[in-house]
């Protein structure tokens, strides 16, 4: 079942070896181990740009995985692939779904904000100013949530919030 590593990246190989050892010695059930192997294989495929293979692995992991936190990361990674393929609406669905399992998944909050900001820019370019404002407001809401959880990670988002007058005192550094 484990995917063979195509690249010669020392860190990736080391991670894979250590992860395999940990999974073997952890007192966990067979399904959790199987889900982890699919997830790990999905990450390896995703890092190599093999998105179809990665998605197949993630969907298998999702069928098996029971742990909400682990499900959130699987859904998040599916969202990353959808966004990479320009499927922003689908990416949003997966990011939102990941937040149902892990509301503090700061990366998903940020990526949702990025997509809403992108939509806002597109609408602004089309002179659809009211709709653009709604998208920018949505982006700011998600960035504020992300910044509250990780205040030093999203400096550009903080600057955008300041420049556009959307920053609130509870997130100012």
Swiss-Prot record:
Record keywords: Chloroplast, Membrane, Photosynthesis, Plastid, Repeat, Thylakoid, TPR repeat
Protein localization: Plastid, Chloroplast thylakoid membrane
Domain of life per record: Eukaryota
A GO term from the CC aspect: chloroplast thylakoid membrane
InterPro entries named in the record: PSI_Ycf3_assembly, TPR-like_helical_dom_sf, TPR_rpt
Biological process annotations from GO: photosynthesis
TPR repeat spans: 35-68, 72-105, 120-153
Disulfide bond entries: none
Pfam families cross-referenced by the UniProt entry: TPR_1, TPR_8
Transcription regulation among keywords: no
Membrane topology field: Peripheral membrane protein
Family: Belongs to the Ycf3 family.
Function summary: Essential for the assembly of the photosystem I (PSI) complex. May act as a chaperone-like factor to guide the assembly of the PSI subunits.
Protein name: Photosystem I assembly protein Ycf3
Native species: Cyanidium caldarium (Red alga)
């Amino acid at each position: 079942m484990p995917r063979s590593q195509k690249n010669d990246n020392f860190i990736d190989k080391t991670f894979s070896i250590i992860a395999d050892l940990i999974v073997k010695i952890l007192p966990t059930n067979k399904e959790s181990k199987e889900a982890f192997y699919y997830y790990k294989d999905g990450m390896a495929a995703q890092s190599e740009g093999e998105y179809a293979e990665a998605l197949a692995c993630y969907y298998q992991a999702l069928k098996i995985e029971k742990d909400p936190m682990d499900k959130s990361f699987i859904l998040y990674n599916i969202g990353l692939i959808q966004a990479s393929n320009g499927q922003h609406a689908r990416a949003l669905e997966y990011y939102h779904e990941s937040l149902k399992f892990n509301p503090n998944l700061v990366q998903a909050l940020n990526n949702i904000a990025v997509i809403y900001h992108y939509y806002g820019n597109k609408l602004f370019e089309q002179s659809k100013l009211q709709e653009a404002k709604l998208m920018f407001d949505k982006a700011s809401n998600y960035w504020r949530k992300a910044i509250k959880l990780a205040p030093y990670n999203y400096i550009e988002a903080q600057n955008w919030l300041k420049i556009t007058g959307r920053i609130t005192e509870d997130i100012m550094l």
